[in-house]
């Protein structure tokens, strides 16, 4: 009998059809690219969040309160080696994140079904954290901040006054920048066109200092 080779190579060319919808790799995919139940970081805010999260090759993102998973998915689309752990308490939304990830080309995205901050225990150390939901959970932002690598980026969004208060306190303790977004889209008003305002969103973003890491290396004699 003829022995079969151990390795078989199969190449498949995927050619887009004439009505295929091209999706770029720049942050800010259309909202309808994601299956969602309304719990979605909208396109303009998502593009802003990703610019501040600043994905680089090989880096890991925690997407906390993932909703539809849009931020974590776009993080992974930035570079083939980028990784995401999406944390979502709702089982239907967690399953939806997995479907969106598979459909948008990042099936290796990891979904953790659980409630933060408890679900964060034991996760690998992140280079960046996005908190899109659950920001009022006691101790959540502090745990995310402490988990970050030096130089890591943390971005959190608030749509309620209660969560705004948490972000204001976080800025007072950890520094960073607070921005309020008001986005309006043109919409029909009878036979005319007017501006339809979306709900205002407050964004807190901060970068964890490198100073502490440098000081620790001096104390332990690990400088080069």
For each feature predicted by the language model, list its residue ranges.
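Conserved class I S-adenosyl-L-methionine
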Residues: 58-67
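Short beta-strand element of Class I
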Residues: 81-85
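Core SAM-dependent methyltransferase catalytic element
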Residues: 8-14, 188-224
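C-terminal substrate-binding/active-site "lid" region of AdoMet-derived donor-dependent transferases
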Residues: 141-202
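A contiguous loop/helix-start segment that scaffolds small-molecule binding in enzyme catalytic cores
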Residues: 1-38
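S-adenosyl-L-methionine
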Residues: 87-128
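Conserved SAM-binding loop of SAM-dependent methyltransferases across substrates and taxa
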Residues: 68-80
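Conserved alpha-helix/loop element of class I SAM-dependent methyltransferases that forms part
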Residues: 40-57
